[in-house]
Amino acid sequence: MAEIKNYTLNFGPQHPAAHGVLRLVLELDGEVIQRADPHIGLLHRATEKLAESKTFIQSVPYMDRLDYVSMMVNEHGYVLAIEKLLGIEVPERAQYIRVLFDEITRVLNHLMWIGAHALDVGAMAVFLYAFREREDLMDVYEAVSGARMHAAYYRPGGVYRDLPDAMPQYKASKIRNEKALAKMNEARSGSVLDFIDDFFARFPKCVDEYETLLTDNRIWKQRLVGIGVVSPERALQMGLTGPMLRGSGIAWDLRKKQPYEVYDRMDFDVPVGVNGDCYDRYLVRVEEMRQSIRIAKQCIEWLRKNPGPVMTDNHKVAPPSRVGMKTNMEDLIHHFKLFTEGFHVPEGEAYAAVEHPKGEFGIYLVSDGANKPYRLKIRAPGFAHLASLDEMARGHMIADAVTIIGTQDIVFGEIDR
């Protein structure tokens, strides 16, 4: 009897559902996946090596470009590692601002994920809904840092600047009439904090809309329930973290288990799944957005009542004031030295991990006492998740591979780095 050979199929790297530059070599028996072999490295930019030739502060913008939909959380892990080595205390207000923007970034990431995941599976409307909300949060990024994506807002010792008193408003143009302009600017008359407060006041209704479209949708459940099941034991063995681990029923969240900044003061719950399939991971991420609203509201309330500095008073690390530089020669020299030579970090090594929207994002930093890192190692959550793809996809159809890639929430900037 003739032996039937498996059929090999290249999925990506130019595939719209490949989430970047994933090349997946699938071994198929008919339409059933026997083996999935991910090929990585197509977006490798040598970030870890580049950091060795840049001062500590010059590497902050590289962090934004790792997972380019969770920008500020990447920066957070990096500056925490530097602060551990320097042994400096970050002002309380800066810690609250960081936590607030971590949660804004988490919502940004999950909105991108829910839109793209639904689009991959075949539900287009959610993508348009999610981007409507992302636009407001992108405007918040722009208001505090001047950039919509690559913010470089977190700095060793604090944040670049305090939250501005005025939220930028849309201007009149050929494509906007007065009525449309008034509606777009109605929440922008106050400060940035007022705008964020207004956003999180109306955001729960938006999450309800996504759930109305998806959670009980018959087709959505047929495509996700029972697909890509990972047992709790295997999830731990494969190094899964974040929603991928919590979807399998393990309540591991660094914000609770190893709290950093002011997360130990925050009141929130850690959602966990039951079955460890794509549907449970979807439910976990949707609930995470609701918990981010709770955390953000607590931060907003505290920030309203407690003004103060947002940068450390350690002048080895903190730049001088703009006013001082215009009148004082010493301040100008200090500023020049800080941004050309940088600051020297004591010899030693440190590991800092943050609860990234995708999992545990860690930075292992080795310093030899110079103004540049001796070695920088990035622990990207997506790397372990992609490694589990073969096991998760075996026995499923080709169409299910798209669902599994979507549920892993993969971004190649951090995997290839």
UniProtKB/Swiss-Prot annotation:
Reaction(s) catalysed (UniProt annotation): a quinone + NADH + 5 H(+)(in) = a quinol + NAD(+) + 4 H(+)(out)
GO cellular component: plasma membrane
One Gene Ontology term of the molecular function aspect: NAD binding
Predominant localisation class: membrane
Keywords associated with the record: Cell inner membrane, Cell membrane, Membrane, NAD, Quinone, Translocase, Transport, Ubiquinone
Membrane disposition: Peripheral membrane protein
InterPro entries with a match to the protein in the record: NADH_Q_OxRdtase_suD (IPR001135), NADH_UbQ_OxRdtase_49kDa_CS (IPR014029), NDH1_su_D/H (IPR022885), NiFe-Hase_large (IPR029014)
Enzyme Commission (EC) number: 7.1.1.-
Compartments (UniProt record): Cell inner membrane
Biological role: NDH-1 shuttles electrons from NADH, via FMN and iron-sulfur (Fe-S) centers, to quinones in the respiratory chain. The immediate electron acceptor for the enzyme in this species is believed to be ubiquinone. Couples the redox reaction to proton translocation (for every two electrons transferred, four hydrogen ions are translocated across the cytoplasmic membrane), and thus conserves the redox energy in a proton gradient.
PANTHER family for the chain: NADH DEHYDROGENASE [UBIQUINONE] IRON-SULFUR PROTEIN 2, MITOCHONDRIAL, NADH-UBIQUINONE OXIDOREDUCTASE 49 KDA SUBUNIT
Name this protein carries in UniProt: NADH-quinone oxidoreductase subunit D
Protein's gene: nuoD
